[in-house]
Amino acid sequence: MLRKGVSFVGQAVQQTLKTQKNLRIQRFSATASQSSEEVNYEIRKDGKRLRGADYEEIVLTSIAGEDKTQIPKGAFDVLLKEYDDLQAESLDFKDKYQRSLAETENVRRRGIKQTDDAKVFAIQSFCKDLLEVSDILDIAVKSVKPEDLESGGKALKDLFEGVSMTRTVMAKTFAKHGLVTVDPTNEKFDPNLHEAVFQIPSANAKQPVGHIEVCTKIGYSLKERPIRPAQVGVVSK
């Protein structure tokens, strides 16, 4: 009987303690729920975003004693709006970044073009002067006939070879710096690129009217820019 009495008293005490604990939790939860409604969940302070740890502390403090796996509605609404704001800012930054890249690329291309233009302008006059020398070398080489070389002796042959080599080296130097010959024979006449020095009646020409039948003096272009027009004979009606 004594044991049963002790057991009964122990159960009664445990039940009383459990009831008191539940009452304390209910009172604390009600207080926390009420306080969470009054908490300011704004994630910005003085125009600056709070750190994650600081905002977490605010939220956890407001739900002390409650289920910490649930976010208060006020905090959820703030975080949802903050997400939308961050997404909009991200898109804005991305757009500005892409525009900045495009502008940087345009500046780089303009810089390269301006540098190339400056280089071409710097050597253009010098190239024009050298073209006259090249023309003279061409005339000198073409004026010597094979039979003249046979009868002219060793001195003439050596001179001819020296002039030919000079002409070849000059042509390679021209090509190295982007200066190339332009022979528009058989092409359509373009007054912007060619200089018509005479006309050929279509009855005596192989090319159609308006085309170049013969080139009497080759032209030159520097970096794809004409610096001397080719002198040509154009087919006319």
Curated annotation (Swiss-Prot):
Any one of the GO BP annotations: protein import into mitochondrial matrix
GO molecular function, one term: unfolded protein binding
InterPro entries in the record: GrpE (IPR000740), GrpE_coiled_coil (IPR013805), GrpE_head (IPR009012)
Location of the protein in the cell: Mitochondrion matrix
Major location category of this protein: mitochondrion
Keywords of the record: Chaperone, Mitochondrion, Transit peptide
A UniProt-annotated Pfam family: GrpE
Keyword Chaperone: yes
Any one cellular-component term (Gene Ontology): PAM complex, Tim23 associated import motor
Homology family: Belongs to the GrpE family.
Function comment: Essential component of the PAM complex, a complex required for the translocation of transit peptide-containing proteins from the inner membrane into the mitochondrial matrix in an ATP-dependent manner. Seems to control the nucleotide-dependent binding of mitochondrial HSP70 to substrate proteins.
Subunit structure: Probable component of the PAM complex at least composed of a mitochondrial HSP70 protein, GrpE, tim-44, tim-16 and tim-14/dnj-21.
PANTHER family in UniProt: GRPE PROTEIN, GRPE PROTEIN HOMOLOG, MITOCHONDRIAL
Protein name per UniProt: GrpE protein homolog, mitochondrial
